[in-house]
């Protein structure tokens, strides 16, 4: 396979440029529809609604099962396959086909639908227009009031399994790279679970390939996919809006990866229901409830380079000689960037066209029936330290469904969501909003907590001006110190940045970077280099380190010692992790000075970007005495922590959790104080991803009684 990867590019890419003005056609036989506009030719299976083939400039882009939804209507008692837009009626301008299943209230078991079935009817549509370099796909879920209560399963997504010609993966600027060869993955050793493997050969030898390294924030990832260093084509998913997704503007989900079997295919995914980082949402439908949801249209975009830059023989030879830290030809980077930048430009065009005028016959609100919400959010933070700016950094404002009982909005996928970036003075405008009743919400970098205002009603074709809205952030006393700043990620801390956080194994390498754990001095230390983004157990077995690695603590690839397949059976429960995946208790210390004896109530505010394990919370001590634990459940402001799998899945974020630990300020003393944070020994996947820490003091408040002794302290 390596020889194929390194073969000199023929520079033919795909066939000659197609006719962008060709008429669209649609044909059908007993088993499929074929849509063709002279640029792309798609074959859609009847029954399942899957895309069996997508040919672009003579190259088949699909592999394996092609493109498909997690659920499928194919087993519905009533199934119809219809041409919903016939190009014969519009002079070849557009074609659309529909595969619809009516279940009559029975469960709709989809292709591997997790957790059972979906108690809805489902329709899948594909559309192609004249000049479109790609195909639109969308799904319509419908729950009539006479259907039984239920949901849409724990996951719902559109997936494409691609041709092996695609060997370059792109999520964002930091994950824009040559992938491992499929055969190298197939012979790799399972580390802990089937989606984590150590490469024992190839250009990424002595590195771990992990499918969760390629998750992205949906709001910030407008175009992502794969490209080919051989055929010089790309294939991309474009969400023109995230209104039909769920989880808000910080939602992290899988975008691209290899399949996790021994013969993997490149994969692109678009989740509207999913929760790998506990940021996902679900659909809970009651008996008698009428509910409809249109997911998409998503644009599956394909593009090519007519004049790709060739790799030199010297570059190809250098890559062939690489084992662990590949020296990839600069021309391959340039070609991949050109394709990706074109896809990003196309994403802007798709957003400008949203909502699409050609979508008819479903619950899809046209532009003239949508509304706009405007206003200005103003910070009122009188207890903030002097010099704190009232201007916003990275303000994001949105409209969501109201919270419903025990189901907060961030976990509710029944409704639509609308988000936009605000300005530094707090002004915002949310356009193209479907009519309905919403809650206005806002997040901002540097501001702890979030803003919410209920009962915002949007009417068809109208603008709602909410005027000036006051946001009073969470704060109960004067600030004694802080570490970092709140932005719902760990990216500001050491190795938490986008160039590093997605790489597998920082929970192992913490022991190499900080052999004596962390001591942080307020006023002297720098959170950007002295505070690691994860606090995890301290690895005690360093046998995972490749003895030939130049800088195993810092280098991107090639720092793990490759193992033999014979040593570790290929199962989800065994592997090298059983040997080096555990560590001792980790204690981090924060030192700070106070000028005098304090009294009143102290508030330790902690925002966590991710949590794994820690059933009893994150133990906190002060001057040698335990004062409780973050997330111990003893106070409504200190609820128990929720596992997000962020450490296991190589992420700097997940469900953001903000907790407050209150204690008697008399425990503070004049001069030097030491506060400790303890993660118990155990699995290296347990611990926290830090977002922000702040200590406040209210001299006039009555202090809480001392907490019970916590075993993590």
Give the ranges of each region predicted by the language model.
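Beta-strand-rich N-terminal accessory domains
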Residues: 14-68
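Extended, loop-rich substrate-binding clefts of extracytoplasmic carbohydrate-active enzymes
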Residues: 71-146
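A contiguous, surface-exposed recognition patch within enzymatic or periplasmic domains that forms
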Residues: 161-293
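A short, amphipathic beta-strand motif
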Residues: 371-382, 426, 469
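Short, acidic Ser/Thr/Gly-rich low-complexity loop/linker segments typical of extracellular
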Residues: 404-427
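Beta-strand-rich ligand-recognition modules
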Residues: 422-425, 572-599, 607-707
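A short, solvent-exposed beta-strand micro-motif common in secreted/extracellular proteins
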Residues: 426, 436-446
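Structured interaction patches on ligand/partner-binding surfaces of diverse proteins
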Residues: 445-474
């Amino acid at each position: 396979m390596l020889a194929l990867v390194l073969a000199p590019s023929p520079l033919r890419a795909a066939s000659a440029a197609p006719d962008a003005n060709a008429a669209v056609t649609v044909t059908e036989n007993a088993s499929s529809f074929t849509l063709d506009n002279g640029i792309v030719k798609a074959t859609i299976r009847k029954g399942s609604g899957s895309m069996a083939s997508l040919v672009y400039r003579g190259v088949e882009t699909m592999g394996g099962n092609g493109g498909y939804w997690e659920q499928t209507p194919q087993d519905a008692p009533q199934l119809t396959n219809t041409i919903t837009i016939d190009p014969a009626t519009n002079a070849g301008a557009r074609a659309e086909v529909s595969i619809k299943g009516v279940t009559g209230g029975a469960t709709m078991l989809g292709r591997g639908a997790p957790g059972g079935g979906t108690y809805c009817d489902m329709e899948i549509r594909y559309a192609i227009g004249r000049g479109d370099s790609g195909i639109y796909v969308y799904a319509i879920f419908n729950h009539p009031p006479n259907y039984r209560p239920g949901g849409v399963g724990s996951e719902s997504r559109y997936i494409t399994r691609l041709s092996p010609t695609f060997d370059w993966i792109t999520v964002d600027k930091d994950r824009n790279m040559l992938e491992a060869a499929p055969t190298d993955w197939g012979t790799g050793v399972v580390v802990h679970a089937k989606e984590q493997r150590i490469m024992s050969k190839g250009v990424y030898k002595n590195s771990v390939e992990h499918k969760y390294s390629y998750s992205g924030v949906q709001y910030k990832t407008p175009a992502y996919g794969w490209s080919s260093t051989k055929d010089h084509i790309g294939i991309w998913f474009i969400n023109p809006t995230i209104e039909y997704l769920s989880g808000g503007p910080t939602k992290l989900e899988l975008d691209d990866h290899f399949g996790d079997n021994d013969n993997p295919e490149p994969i692109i995914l678009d989740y509207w229901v999913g929760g790998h980082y506990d940021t996902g949402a679900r659909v809970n439908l009651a008996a008698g409830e009428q509910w409809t949801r249109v997911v998409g249209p998503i644009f599956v975009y394909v593009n090519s380079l007519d004049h790709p830059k060739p790799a030199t023989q010297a570059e190809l030879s250098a890559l062939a000689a690489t084992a662990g830290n590949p020296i990839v030809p600069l021309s391959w980077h340039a070609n991949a960037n050109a394709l990706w930048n074109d896809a990003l430009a196309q994403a802007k065009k798709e957003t400008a066209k949203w909502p699409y005028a050609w979508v008819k016959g479903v619950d899809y609100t046209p532009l003239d029936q949508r509304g706009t919400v405007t206003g200005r959010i103003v910070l009122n933070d009188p207890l903030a330290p002097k010099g704190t700016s009232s201007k916003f950094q990275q303000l994001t404002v949105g409209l969501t469904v109201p919270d419903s009982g025990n189901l907060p909005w961030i976990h509710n996928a029944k409704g639509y969501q609308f988000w936009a970036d605000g300005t530094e003075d707090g002004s915002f405008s949310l356009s193209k909003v479907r009519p309905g009743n919403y809650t206005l919400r806002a997040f901002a970098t540097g501001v702890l907590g979030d803003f919410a205002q209920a009962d915002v009603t949007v009417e068809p074709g109208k603008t709602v001006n909410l005027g000036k809205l006051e946001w009073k952030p969470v704060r109960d006393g004067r600030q004694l110190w802080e570490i970092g700043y709140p932005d719902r990620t760990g990216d500001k801390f050491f190795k938490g940045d986008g160039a590093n956080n997605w790489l597998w194994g920082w929970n192992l390498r913490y022991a190499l970077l900080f052999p004596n754990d962390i001591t942080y001095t307020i006023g002297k230390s720098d959170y950007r280099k002295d505070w690691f983004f994860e606090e995890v157990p301290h690895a005690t077995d360093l046998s995972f380190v490749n003895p030939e690695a130049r800088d195993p603590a810092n280098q991107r690839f090639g720092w793990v010692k490759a193992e033999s397949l014979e040593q570790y059976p290929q199962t989800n429960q065994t592997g090298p992790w059983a040997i080096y995946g555990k560590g001792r208790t980790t204690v981090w210390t924060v030192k700070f000075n106070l000028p005098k004896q304090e009294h009143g109530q102290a508030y330790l505010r902690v925002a966590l970007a991710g949590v794994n394990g820690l059933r009893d919370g994150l133990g906190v001590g002060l001057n040698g005495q335990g004062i409780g634990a973050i997330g111990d459940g003893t106070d409504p402001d200190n609820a128990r922590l929720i596992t997000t799998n962020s450490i296991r899945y190589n992420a700097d974020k997940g469900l953001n959790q903000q907790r407050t630990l209150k204690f008697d300020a008399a425990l503070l003393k004049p001069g030097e104080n030491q506060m400790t944070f303890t993660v118990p020994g155990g699995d290296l996947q347990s611990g926290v991803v830090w977002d922000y820490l702040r200590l406040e003091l209210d001299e006039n408040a009555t202090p809480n009684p001392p907490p019970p002794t916590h075993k993590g302290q």
